[in-house]
């Protein structure tokens, strides 16, 4: 009989969001007339920008003609999309990238998991706590960890607490690690890191021959001009950092699927025999073997985001969500709730009132306010006592949800 990958059995029962879905389904089945407002999972609600949608339609129409038909595209992505991203998104930051250093994908969630294919299993990994669950769980799935302890910490992973004391920015590890996950603007806490704070991590990585996985999925939501949008804005990052970006929240592509990975040619690892080797070459080899490229219509739509009109419309949608974030943040503060984030990120990280557990507060909001959020403990043990609300809802629902919560907590 074929053997399974036993590493999957190490995972705690139920990925966070399916568990939320299960509880919501149970509630709605028992309360069919209740209007449940979902501010939990970070799915977008606004339509695609008109210019983006027009490009999407035009690309589909291309497939109906012999002259314009597009079959298999380049696995790394079309140059016209890669160059548009470099010119419009990176060069204004003072970051110069080569076309060969960027890879278009079908989403950064997959990329954050798939990048592990090119790293040896005996690398020591450091992740924040709380953290986007994909970082933790994919390392378990691939076989890098031992079992989880009673807190949920897995053997062979170094956890870096992110709490009020350190402003939810992890401190440098006290031991040598090989791979470091950083996410700014952060999911779930909504916090951001300054250039000086990122420089500490870059210096650590270069001094210890470590690699930083920098998740910049929410960089488009930054409002403070002093906060870096890319880790490559900081000197030395091209030698030690791989950056992930996503169109999911930036352009509303959660149902369209498109992302990108930047792997600079300078980022090197070592072979088992101690020789240096390019991670860019390994990722290209992995990509051409396991991926046939994001679809042509999707890449045409993504390129339209960077047109003058496309970006103007996309920015209006981003501003809409950030106004939602302001409404949530300010509304909760009115009733004395301690909140973080929601200024340079679309997530509000709130401290649960009265010392309630994260899941107890989830049940309270669901049952008493008919509002769904995300328990902080689902992102890791250090998230206990906190709760995440998303700004990606419809404005009228956000306003109503905040009013319900305020009334309940007064």
From Swiss-Prot:
Gene3D superfamilies: Aspartate Aminotransferase, domain 1 (3.90.1150.10), Type I PLP-dependent aspartate aminotransferase-like (Major domain) (3.40.640.10). GO terms for molecular function: L,L-diaminopimelate aminotransferase activity; pyridoxal phosphate binding. Keywords: Aminotransferase, Pyridoxal phosphate, Transferase. It catalyses: (2S,6S)-2,6-diaminopimelate + 2-oxoglutarate = (S)-2,3,4,5-tetrahydrodipicolinate + L-glutamate + H2O + H(+). The modification N6-(pyridoxal phosphate)lysine is found at residue 249. Substrate binds at residues 15, 42, 109, 132, 187, 292, 388. Pyridoxal 5'-phosphate binds at residues 72, 108-109, 132, 187, 218, 246-248, 257, 292. SUPFAM superfamilies: PLP-dependent transferases. Pathway: Amino-acid biosynthesis; L-lysine biosynthesis via DAP pathway; LL-2,6-diaminopimelate from (S)-tetrahydrodipicolinate (aminotransferase route): step 1/1. It is an enzyme of class 2 (transferase). Its EC number is 2.6.1.83. Its cofactor is pyridoxal 5'-phosphate. One of its GO terms (biological process) is lysine biosynthetic process via diaminopimelate. InterPro entries: Aminotransferase_I/II_large, DapL/ALD1, PyrdxlP-dep_Trfase, PyrdxlP-dep_Trfase_major, PyrdxlP-dep_Trfase_small. Homodimer. Belongs to the class-I pyridoxal-phosphate-dependent aminotransferase family. LL-diaminopimelate aminotransferase subfamily. HAMAP family: DapL_aminotrans_1. This is LL-diaminopimelate aminotransferase. It comes from Trichlorobacter lovleyi (strain ATCC BAA-1151 / DSM 17278 / SZ) (Geobacter lovleyi). The gene is dapL.
């Amino acid at each position: 009989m074929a053997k399974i990958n036993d590493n999957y059995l190490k995972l705690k029962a139920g990925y966070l969001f399916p568990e939320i879905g299960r509880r919501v389904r149970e509630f709605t089945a028992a309360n069919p007339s209740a209007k449940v407002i979902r501010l939990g999972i970070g799915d977008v609600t606004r339509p695609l920008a008109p210019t983006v949608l027009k490009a999407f339609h035009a690309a589909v129409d291309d497939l109906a003609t012999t002259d314009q038909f597009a079959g298999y595209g380049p696995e790394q992505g079309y140059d016209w999309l890669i160059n548009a991203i470099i010119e419009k998104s990176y060069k204004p930051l003072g970051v110069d990238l080569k076309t060969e250093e960027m890879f278009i994908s079908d989403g950064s969630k997959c990329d954050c998991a798939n990048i592990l294919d090119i790293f040896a299993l005996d690398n020591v990994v450091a992740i924040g706590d709380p953290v986007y669950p994909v970082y933790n769980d994919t390392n378990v799935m691939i076989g890098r960890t031992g079992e989880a302890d009673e807190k949920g910490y897995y053997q062979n992973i170094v956890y870096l607490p992110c709490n009020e004391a350190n402003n939810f920015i992890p401190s440098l590890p006290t031991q040598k690690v090989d791979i470091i996950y950083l996410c700014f603007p952060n999911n779930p806490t909504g916090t951001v890191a300054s250039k000086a704070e990122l420089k500490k991590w870059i210096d650590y990585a270069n001094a210890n021959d470590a690699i930083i996985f920098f998740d910049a999925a929410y960089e488009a939501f930054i409002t403070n001009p002093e906060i870096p949008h890319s880790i490559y804005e900081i000197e030395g990052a091209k030698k030690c950092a791989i950056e992930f970006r996503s169109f999911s929240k930036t352009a509303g592509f959660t149902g369209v699927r498109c992302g990108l990975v930047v792997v600079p040619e300078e980022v090197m690892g070592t072979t088992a025999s101690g020789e240096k080797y390019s991670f860019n070459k390994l990722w290209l080899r992995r990509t051409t073997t396991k991926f046939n490229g994001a679809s042509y219509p999707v890449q045409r739509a993504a390129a339209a985001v960077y047109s003058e009109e496309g970006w103007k419309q996309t920015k209006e949608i981003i501003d809409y969500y950030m106004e939602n974030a302001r409404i949530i943040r300010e509304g909760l503060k009115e009733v004395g709730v301690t909140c973080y984030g929601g200024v340079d990120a679309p997530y509000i990280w709130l401290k649960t009132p009265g010392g309630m557990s994260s899941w107890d507060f989830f049940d309270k909001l669901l049952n008493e306010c008919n509002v769904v959020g995300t328990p902080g403990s689902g992102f890791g043990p250090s998230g206990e006592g906190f709760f995440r609300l998303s700004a990606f809802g419809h404005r009228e629902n956000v306003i109503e949800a905040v009013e319900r919560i305020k009334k309940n907590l007064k």
